[in-house]
Amino acid sequence: MKIGVLALQGAVSEHIRLLTNSGAEAIEIKRADQLAEVDGLILPGGESTAMRRLIDKYQLFKPLREFGESGKPILGTCAGLILMAKTLSGEQDGHLGFIDMVVERNAFGRQRDSFEATLDVKGVAEKLTAVFIRAPLVKEVGPDVDILSEYNGEIVAVKQGSFLACSFHPELTDDARLHQAFIKMVAERSVLEAH
């Protein structure tokens, strides 16, 4: 089982490390043709507008949409969550539109407002250390979206079908439980496809 990490920008090596430490084969994705090699994909944190520009530059938008529409699992963290949103507050449309949610960018403020919190993430982990850096917030979700975690009453982790997304950076700690939960999602999907 192979899991790709979109390697255009952002915390790529940290995701690779946690995936590898959890027993998955992890590869950096830089070209559209590489998506065919992987069973699941991580859209890492970084800067969402820069990431979107690079996605367009390398003609990855349509292949990423098709990857998600095929039912293969995708995990988005921080900027990745923004890319997965159907709607961005104050803007017309989201980017990939995989999750029926309204997201507000930089809702927790700029870099100096970075902080850590301990969260319970439903079905994933209790007391997970979450690192927030200029983090987005999920302001609203549709009826098919499962809220997995909240911080001070604000939604910070969601799941819809084969899509998992969080406002924080799970890759910036040594706690691999969110990655392990994602690996399990990918493994279960791979078993279904094999039958």
Swiss-Prot record:
Catalytic machinery residues: 78 (nucleophile), 169 (charge relay system), 171 (charge relay system)
Any one GO CC term of the record: cytosol
One Pfam match: SNO
UniProt pathway annotation: Cofactor biosynthesis; pyridoxal 5'-phosphate biosynthesis
NCBIfam families listed in its UniProt record: PLP_synth_Pdx2
Subunit (UniProt): In the presence of PdxS, forms a dodecamer of heterodimers. Only shows activity in the heterodimer.
Family affiliation: Belongs to the glutaminase PdxT/SNO family.
Name of the protein in question: Pyridoxal 5'-phosphate synthase subunit PdxT
Species of provenance: Shouchella clausii (strain KSM-K16) (Alkalihalobacillus clausii)
Record lineage: Bacteria, Bacillati, Bacillota, Bacilli, Bacillales
Gene symbol of the encoding locus: pdxT
